[in-house]
């Protein structure tokens, strides 16, 4: 059975090897987390699921990381919030420039951005 990003969130299947790979994958990226490593031969900066940053993926990974590596989770959260603040509610973004692509005023970007910034406000 293959495991998708949903499993990362629902079952918290993150282990140290996965976290290490995520850190390595993101270490040279200004905007986290690209859907394909920028140095991979299949990387395409503007093409669906071939390289862009997706806020929904960052959100799922952040939620899965919170109980495993809070420092890295907070880095993803902070960079995701900053990306949306700077570039807007686009569907997806360049991992190199942060430029938004796809639909503008995209609802899942807006909803997940709100979830991230409002988290812990009522605690």
Segment roles from a protein language model:
Residues 1-9:
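Single conserved hydrophobic/aromatic residue that forms the stacking wall/gate
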Residues 14-113, 117-123:
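Non-catalytic carbohydrate-binding regions of carbohydrate-active enzymes
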